[in-house]
């Protein structure tokens, strides 16, 4: 059994469970698998570690209502390996007030190398009659943010009040296809290429707006360099 891991193993981890626990503290709240906390500088923090399970609309209303008093919001999707595209879309829909073109998707139409359909527009529509975030937000990413999370980051990156901070995502936006070869090997690959609004391929990852790596000096002091960069950014762009 072997797996190709170079696409994230050759990059900095840029995430630490133990340091994150320091930031969350013992009194953090949890809803639909998301952990959230309000930092002492009045910046809200949500950690979304997976899109595998559904996120309830009522749960999102509750979380965003509680955090509405904050000056800015950090959404951390580092080490989120994806899950359901609909769940990722549901979360992103809370950050726009209008319908936005976020990209294009093609589908395989035949056995040939280039047998794909004409790219079809993908739109993000706001969650109407639901609580939507109106202030600045930052999304934290690393190379282990992939699959449906890559799609989430693409949707968020195009929004005017959202900034991506951290490392390049792991890619893999396209809908996965799984099969087994005659020798018993399992193969899994993206069968539906996805592009951003400028028709740039998303398969190999999305660059952050502001690239930040966690420094070893900070880590020794239980400080998350990427979270601190996000806090600094939100304070300097406070509305």
Identify the function of each model-found stretch.
Residues 233-239:
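C-terminal cap/linker of serine protease catalytic domains
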Residues 1-107, 115-121, 136, 178-180, ...:
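Flexible, low-complexity junctional segments that flank or bridge functional domains
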